[in-house]
């Protein structure tokens, strides 16, 4: 199982299914999940310890202790508008 998972939310995704996936990921040993919301150009970070945070379009994502030294601007995850 990977340490980091990226989940991209589409307009048809159901919240309950996403929550179920998150539980499955963390049960399997995933440490960090980035749930990417293309419509709002934002990301929600979920951590295995239960912590989490919204990162908006002007924010930065880091690999934290999962990918030390890695960072990316949220805006770079999406095509230019």
Q: Which residues make up each language-model segment?
A:
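C-terminal interaction segment
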Residues: 1-28, 32-81
């Amino acid at each position: 199982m990977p340490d980091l998972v990226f989940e991209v939310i589409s307009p048809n995704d159901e919240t309950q299914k996403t929550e179920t996936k998150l539980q499955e990921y963390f049960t399997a040993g995933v440490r960090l999940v980035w749930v990417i919301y293309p419509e709002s150009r934002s990301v929600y970070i979920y951590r295995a310890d239960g912590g989490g945070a919204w990162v908006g379009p002007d924010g930065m994502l880091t690999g934290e202790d999962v990918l030390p030294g890695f960072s990316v601007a949220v805006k770079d995850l999406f095509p230019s508008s």
